[in-house]
């Protein structure tokens, strides 16, 4: 994958989440700047999603732990646990919000 392709795909991933924040039943907010997306929860905790361009990865930090996702085929996969990004971000957001949160891939 070229650097250009990586940036397009990583930005699309974050944009997909941004587009869904207002429709989310949990009272979430977000801030986005320079390849970093912060999801802000009602208790002021955050999930931080950021691009790691040199590694062609997307890193996710929750209040519980951190994960590094890399593109395998057409899915972002955690390089330690093997979890798929959308499944992981739904579970992590639900856990952090204390209520059901569902994000959907745009693919």
Curated annotation (Swiss-Prot):
<dbReference type="InterPro" id="IPR020895">
    <property type="entry name" value="Frataxin_CS"/>
</dbReference>
<dbReference type="GO" id="GO:0008198">
    <property type="term" value="F:ferrous iron binding"/>
</dbReference>
<dbReference type="InterPro" id="IPR047584">
    <property type="entry name" value="CyaY"/>
</dbReference>
<keyword id="KW-0408">Iron</keyword>
<keyword id="KW-0479">Metal-binding</keyword>
<protein>
    <recommendedName>
        <fullName>Iron-sulfur cluster assembly protein CyaY</fullName>
    </recommendedName>
</protein>
<comment type="similarity">
    <text>Belongs to the frataxin family.</text>
</comment>
<dbReference type="GO" id="GO:0016226">
    <property type="term" value="P:iron-sulfur cluster assembly"/>
</dbReference>
<dbReference type="GO" id="GO:0005829">
    <property type="term" value="C:cytosol"/>
</dbReference>
<dbReference type="GO" id="GO:0008199">
    <property type="term" value="F:ferric iron binding"/>
</dbReference>
<dbReference type="InterPro" id="IPR036524">
    <property type="entry name" value="Frataxin/CyaY_sf"/>
</dbReference>
<dbReference type="Pfam" id="PF01491">
    <property type="entry name" value="Frataxin_Cyay"/>
</dbReference>
<comment type="function">
    <text>Involved in iron-sulfur (Fe-S) cluster assembly. May act as a regulator of Fe-S biogenesis.</text>
</comment>
<dbReference type="InterPro" id="IPR002908">
    <property type="entry name" value="Frataxin/CyaY"/>
</dbReference>
């Amino acid at each position: 994958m070229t650097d250009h392709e990586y940036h397009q795909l990583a930005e699309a991933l974050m944009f997909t989440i941004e587009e869904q924040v207002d429709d989310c039943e949990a009272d979430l907010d977000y801030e986005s700047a320079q390849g970093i997306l912060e999801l802000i929860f009602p208790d002021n905790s955050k999930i931080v999603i950021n691009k790691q361009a040199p590694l062609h990865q997307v890193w996710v930090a929750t209040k519980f732990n951190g994960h590094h996702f890399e593109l395998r085929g057409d899915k972002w996969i955690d390089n330690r646990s093997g979890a798929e990004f959308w499944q992981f971000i739904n579970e992590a957001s639900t856990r952090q919000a204390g209520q059901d949160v569902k994000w959907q891939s745009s693919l």
